[in-house]
């Protein structure tokens, strides 16, 4: 057990934590510092030649650019374009017109629509947009953000068309379909429980005498809706993950959940059994035609059709596009990895195509589309730099042996109890960076090597990192700031953190139990 090597290997990670949390540096600056430190340490302590450091870095940069950065920019561009064309306003109006019960509205907006936004775009949109919608409907600001934080955690490993799962699978050499499936098995209890928690938070209101509704009163009339909302979400997502992959798991899951929740909500409204204290006065929006509704959803419908039509479910198309790919080895040292660049059949390409066509359907001119694309690239440049730096750092640390030093020390100290710590490690990554993708890039290799040392499934251990991300994301300072900014509130970060922290801590305890009890499952 080399304590010195362990401590030195942690320096790039500690740097990132300290710079982000203590000195409030932007993520891209802190990530560059971590990358530079990893290169210096790899050369000075692990004696990795300069050429190998350079090629390891280049491998990380290329992996970040294609497909991760491509998908990120494409997804956010699609969202930005829908905002500029007014499509997002139409979609929001459609969802909020379904019910006037605050508990059901929270499910529809934060859980179903928020899950859809996470699957399609991610990067804060799934907290900011639903939180703003809830506040606009009359929810108090901090509870509105709290509801969206609770809703946003569990779908995060499949955000931005599955990028967190796809990227960590590529990094550690695992099959993305199998990894996505194992992750969903681990996350399933939280998918089912979270809508119930959302209902409890949304229903925490007082009557005219100041008496707060009890737990039973808050659940009355909507508990079944919440339960089925969660079950339908994870059930549909699991099927998609098993047969299509992580890219559409949360997208399809959220759509199925939205359709079922909307139907059940309308039925509950008509029953007349909903408690009047949870009623909200909502102004009726303009009557929408089928044409305007389809136009508003066109970008997302096209993304769904294109990704599904080019997946393994359509072997003829999938096989025809497979040759349009390049396989290269960049690292010049021992045991280099192989990078695969799919030039056509990659989610980013299809998302861009869907956005261009959908934007035209929504009435966007080529000039407007170009303006939105340019603005999106500029908007996402800090994220691009962060991804390049984090992937470069991860590759240098991996090839130099720094990851091995960290995992060897953790195994020596924790032994067979290491799986208990695995979700907490993933949570720390998400808490610090505010990103499920970055957490996987930082700690995915550590989890994989720990699995090999313990003789347990790589898939189970790497999936535990994503499990922890679900809890860490909801307490990340970046996520809190995005949510509060969306409801135009300042100085409430501590109050919001205090409200969400017990939920995250409770989740992590349950995650550790799942980590230990489930490692023997035949997955």
Indicate where each model-derived feature is located.
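Structural signature of hydrophobic alpha-helical transmembrane segments
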Residues: 1-11, 64-68, 121-126, 179-193, ...
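Alpha-helical transmembrane segments of multi-pass membrane proteins
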Residues: 103-115, 140-154, 175-195, 199, ...
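Structural signal for alpha-helical transmembrane segments and their membrane-water exit/capping regions
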Residues: 4-6, 16-52, 74-85, 261-272, ...
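Membrane-embedded alpha-helical segments and adjacent helix-loop junctions characteristic
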Residues: 54-137, 146, 363-450
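Transmembrane helical segments that form the transport core of multi-pass membrane transport proteins
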Residues: 253, 280-426
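Juxtamembrane and boundary regions of transmembrane helices in multi-pass small-molecule transporters
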Residues: 157, 161-278, 469-523
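Interfacial loop-to-helix junctions that mark the boundaries of transmembrane helices
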Residues: 1-5, 24-30, 54-66, 178-185, ...
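Juxtamembrane helix-boundary/capping and inter-helix hinge elements in multi-pass membrane proteins
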Residues: 25, 84-87, 100-101, 134-144, ...
């Amino acid at each position: 057990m080399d304590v010195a090597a362990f401590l030195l290997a942690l320096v790039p990670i500690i740097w990132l934590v300290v710079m982000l949390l203590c000195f409030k540096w932007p993520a891209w600056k802190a990530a560059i510092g971590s990358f530079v430190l990893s290169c210096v340490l790899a050369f000075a302590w692990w004696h990795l030649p300069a050429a190998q450091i350079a090629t390891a870095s280049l491998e990380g940069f290329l992996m970040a650019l294609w497909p991760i950065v491509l998908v990120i920019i494409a997804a956010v561009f699609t969202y930005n374009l829908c905002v500029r064309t007014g499509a997002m306003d139409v979609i929001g109006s459609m969802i909020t017109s379904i019910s006037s019960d605050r508990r059901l509205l929270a499910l529809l907006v934060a859980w179903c629509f928020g899950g859809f936004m996470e699957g399609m775009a991610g990067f804060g949109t799934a907290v900011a947009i639903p939180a703003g919608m809830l506040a606009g409907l009359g929810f108090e600001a901090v509870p509105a953000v709290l509801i969206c934080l609770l809703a946003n955690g569990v779908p995060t490993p499949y955000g931005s068309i599955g990028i967190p799962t796809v990227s960590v699978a590529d990094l550690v050499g695992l099959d993305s379909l199998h990894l996505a499936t194992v992750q969903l098995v681990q996350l399933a209890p939280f998918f089912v429980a979270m809508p119930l928690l959302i209902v409890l938070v949304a229903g925490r209101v007082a009557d005219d005498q100041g008496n707060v509704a009890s737990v039973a009163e808050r659940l009355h009339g909507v508990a079944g809706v919440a339960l089925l909302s969660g079950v339908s979400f994870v059930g549909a997502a699991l099927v998609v993950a098993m047969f299509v992959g992580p890219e559409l798991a949360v997208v399809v899951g959220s759509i199925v959940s939205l359709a079922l929740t909307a139907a059940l909500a309308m039925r509950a409204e008509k029953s007349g059994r909903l408690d009047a204290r949870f009623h909200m006065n909502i102004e009726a929006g303009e009557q929408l035609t089928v044409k305007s509704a389809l136009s508003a959803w066109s970008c997302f419908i096209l993304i769904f059709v294109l990704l599904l039509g080019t997946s393994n479910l359509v072997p003829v198309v999938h096989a025809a596009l497979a040759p349009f790919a390049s396989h290269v080895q960049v690292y010049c040292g021992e045991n280099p990895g192989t990078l695969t660049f799919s030039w056509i059949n990659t989610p980013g390409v299809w998302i861009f195509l869907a956005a261009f066509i959908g934007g035209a359907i929504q009435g966007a001119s080529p000039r407007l589309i170009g303006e939105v694309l340019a603005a999106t690239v500029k908007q996402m440049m800090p994220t691009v730099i962060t991804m390049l730096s984090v992937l470069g750092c991860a590759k240098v640390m991996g090839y130099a042996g720094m990851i091995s030093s960290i995992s060897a020390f953790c195994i020596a100290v924790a032994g067979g109890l290491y799986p208990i710590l695995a979700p907490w490690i993933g949570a720390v990554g998400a808490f610090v960076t505010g990103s499920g993708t970055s957490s996987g890039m930082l700690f995915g290799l550590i989890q994989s090597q720990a699995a090999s040392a313990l003789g347990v499934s790589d898939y189970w251990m790497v999936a535990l990192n994503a499990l922890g991300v679900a809890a860490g994301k909801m307490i990340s300072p970046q996520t809190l700031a995005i949510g509060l900014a969306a409801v135009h509130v300042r100085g409430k970060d501590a109050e919001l953190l205090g409200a969400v922290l017990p939920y995250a801590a409770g989740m992590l305890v349950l995650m550790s139990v799942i980590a230990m009890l489930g490692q023997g499952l035949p997955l």
